[in-house]
């Protein structure tokens, strides 16, 4: 027997949301080079385009995105990264074969200090139809809690108490 495309089921939701840092991208090396002697993160270094290249691909999560994309789902990446890093981010996504239909990033002019869970809710409200979201994949506890409070099935791919 053959298995048909799961997304061909009538009335099925068709959008899958992925977080980027800590979910699709493993950021340990970038965090290491961006940490000040006092232990605090230097956000300028952390979001420096050169340092973004240090990120490692989270292969199981990227494979999940590839499989869903092959099945016809819309892949949307919601990221707390500044839109000033969009070129470096798109380059990293391409190099690591991460499929996506839409990349939505933090507006560096208006959202600089917006907490990520508020930012992601705003991104959802302004850019997507919540009724079309099939699944969310994220790592951060506060953001996972937001998605689940909205009734969205959410896979948490890493410890996210930060």
Q: Where are the predicted features?
A:
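Alpha-helical substrate-recognition element adjacent to the catalytic core
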Residues: 11-111
């Amino acid at each position: 027997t053959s298995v048909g495309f799961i997304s061909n089921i009538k009335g099925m939701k068709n959008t899958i949301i992925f977080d980027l840092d800590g979910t699709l991208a493993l950021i340990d090396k970038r965090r290491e080079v961006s940490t000040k002697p006092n232990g605090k993160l230097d956000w300028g270094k952390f979001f420096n385009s050169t340092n973004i290249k240090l990120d490692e691909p989270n292969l199981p999560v990227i494979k999940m995105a590839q499989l869903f994309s092959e099945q016809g789902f819309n892949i949307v990446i919601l990221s707390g990264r500044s839109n000033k890093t969009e070129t470096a981010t798109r380059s990293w996504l391409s190099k690591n074969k991460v499929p996506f239909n839409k990349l939505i990033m933090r507006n560096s002019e208006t959202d600089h200090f917006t907490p990520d869970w508020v930012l992601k809710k705003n991104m959802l409200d302004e850019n997507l139809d919540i009724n079309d979201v099939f699944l969310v994949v994220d790592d951060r506890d506060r953001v996972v809690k937001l998605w689940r409070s909205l009734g969205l099935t959410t896979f948490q791919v890493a410890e996210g108490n930060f």
